[in-house]
Amino acid sequence: MNDNLETVQLLPLTSDIVFKQVFGQEESKPILRVFLNDVLGLDIQSSEQITLLNPIIDPKYLDDKMCILDVRVQLSDRSLIDIEIQVLNRHNMEKRALYYTCQLCTEQLHTGDDYSKTAPVYGLNLLCFDLYKDSRYYRSFVLKDEETNETYRQTFKISFFELRKAVSELSQTKEVETFELSGLTARDQWALFINSGQQEVYEKLIEENKTFEEAYERLKKASSDETLMAMYRNREKAIRDWNDSITSARKDGVQQGEQRVNMLYERLLQENRGSEIPKAIADPAFRTKLFNEYGI
């Protein structure tokens, strides 16, 4: 690896805008092919089988902390894949994942279309927080018969990839050079690449697999792009503002001594209406309206 690679301050791949730039562009398709095969267990033979449906990053949406910067893919067999990376735990992840994966199904058909045109769908959710209590960092959910355990013929899969769990032991240690990649699965290695942020880890992975070198080069290029850096900072500011509003909302509930206030904010988060929280904080009349709406 070239010595000058270490002189670049790399942006975090756990940022949705950085992830999309590295994995979700036309020139990223060879990397994306290997990533999808390794993580989802697919068998995509060529990057030509991949069509990116939303490669453009529109700067006007980046100050909206609720907007989704996902990577949406269609394969040559018409299968649809939605990849989303989530930094914040808004306590609605399972419902959110279900909604957007179902949306992949409903958006395929138009009035008069035959149901046979419905293609397999995959929702891949990369999480920077722990969603489940056990130690497994990757799990997939499919539709099955309750009695026979027979899998539904039409592929509908929702996967959760809990990055922090996957690298909790390796990425936090300062003795990174002591671990052996030979004991790790391909999925383990991707978790390290995305979440560790350590130069030693990148070097180990690059020695093991050329795909990681290509992904590293894209990350380095993205980190040197002034326009993308500005977009990243705007995005991070929007997320910080979101965090501040949630913290303020919870303090507001405590200070007022009203359990119902905190209940309201939690309900809004669960139903993907978190953007209404700042108004609920500032406007008592609007807050009362929401109390009535939810029966709190």
Where are these regions (language model features)?
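Elongated, amphipathic alpha-helical interaction scaffolds
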Residues: 1-296
